[in-house]
Amino acid sequence: MGKVLKTVEAITAKTKIAIACQGGGSQTAFTAGALKALCEARIADEFEIVSMSGTSGGAVCAVLVWHALERGDHQPWRQLMDFWQDNSAKGWAEIAFNQLLVESVRMINSGLLPTFQLSPASAVSQSLMQFATMGLRENFTSFQTLLEKHVDFAEIASWGPRAKRPILMVGAANVTTGMLTKFISNREPIRVEHVLASCAVPTIFPAVLIGEDAFWDGLFSDNPPVQELIRPSSVGAENVPEEIWLIKINPTRRETVPVRIDDIIDRRNQLEGNISLFQQLRHVEMLNDMQLSHAFRPEFLGQFDIKAPVRIPKSFSGSPNKPYHIPCIEMSPELAETLDYESKIDRSAEHIEHLIIEGEQCARAFLRERALTVAAEPLVATSS
């Protein structure tokens, strides 16, 4: 009878997944669209979201959905959509400011305008920004104000460290120690400073001080955290995922060699954004391959409820196929080719809306492709 019950439980158990959201400024409106589509598809009926991670704009999207899920919202994507609508330029003044900023940076990166290197923490930079943004909404000019409007950090603080699923993980880089830092919801309440730290691009925002430490953008950390999602010491032994769903912003492949300086800057940023991701995926691949080779004792795997290798996406399309590979959610090559570095700071409503729609479409395609892939490559349990 006991064996029968265990068999029924195994059949009806939901697949445990972790969702990792890469950073990329305004381009992470794509991530927002993808998360919206996943929620609308009612993935919770079939899957158990055990953890979410993100850096920079990916962290913002992850925090918004996580907060809504923790509050029991039946439509967790609405909080996400409200944020991005508020983050878009509204009215002629904001539209003009956004266009001037984007085009100025584009001309500087193209070598058509001189650049003046000013620290974002300097009094001159802050005075210039205050002058340039006079009359604009505070939600548009103050990132902290925008975050605090859409996420109740006081409520999160009242929860304390939260062991409840999903576990939230926000990546940032410690400027002075060089350590890759993860702010994890089961260890401490997620604060607005944690999200600001993950988004602190050093040429745009001053380093974020938390206690005696200063932090920069998650691009210099794990973009996004992936390895930590499978570590029991980070997420809890019961929250090790069976699959990691990656929402990727930076394209892996480019068809032509960049020659113009603005194209070089764009491609360099993409490569920098993917370095840590690929390193982490290769590490998980190595562990998966060892598991398939029976390098781990069944009783060791049983401690963490690990029944098979963790399904993850491939780093490169030309790499050999492995039975644990699944697709990732990423932009179509056609869209990626139309985006440049400056599109990561573009907050025009049309740009944001286009990326959200693309994210929705790609997430729906991912669900279809993933189902076919998993059906074609069932993983045999490696522990008893």
Walk through the language-model features, giving the residues of each:
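Patatin-like phospholipase
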Residues: 1-53, 60-384
